Amino acid sequence: MTRNKHIWIFNAGNSYSGNPKWLFEYIRRHHPDIRTVWMCYHKDVRNYVKRLGYEACLFDSTAGKTIMKEAGVYVVEMCKEVFQPELAGITILNLWHGVGCKSIERKVTGGFLQERIAKKYIRNNRIYKNAQLFLVTSELMEKHFMEQCGIDEELLIRAGYPRCTVTDPVCTYPHDIRAIKGLSDDARIVVYAPTYRDY
């Protein structure tokens, strides 16, 4: 079956977020020739995306399986553990979810994630090596991801992350935290958001 390069499906795990969200929003606004569909594991995410006025499907639904068979591009931000059979032959655009100097993917040598990571590379290595394009933000990150994820240089795309470069206004949730919490305009807010570490 020939895949349609004008149908792109997107996923960011169990939410509508991250680099896939920002590229999804950008393509919807600037490339009407491309059909965009947000793929979901859970009904609450699907319903949320639909309330925004966008097309969304559950992976395990008839509509989801049909669109997975037709789509030409699958946009993600991680090395997925599961590739549904309907995705065979699709081009994967991995936007990753950030940069950092920690060991990831193939270079994880301990902790509870090690076994899961090893299993997914045994199961999906052919897909990662042959069907996945990988976004990197700099020459330094090229080296990092080639080493950490085993990606060949010809599959790298050097560009900025969509969430950092897309400047279109997006109205997916209210952003005025002070107003939501009933705080004054000069109230100071502190955020503590550590990255998970297993070492």
Feature names for model-found ranges:
Residues 1-5, 171-191:
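Nucleotide-sugar donor-binding and catalytic loop/hinge architecture
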Residues 196-197:
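Acidic, glycine-rich loop-and-beta core segments that form the ion-binding/anion-interacting portion
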Residues 7-171:
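Active-site and donor-binding regions of nucleotide-sugar-utilizing enzymes
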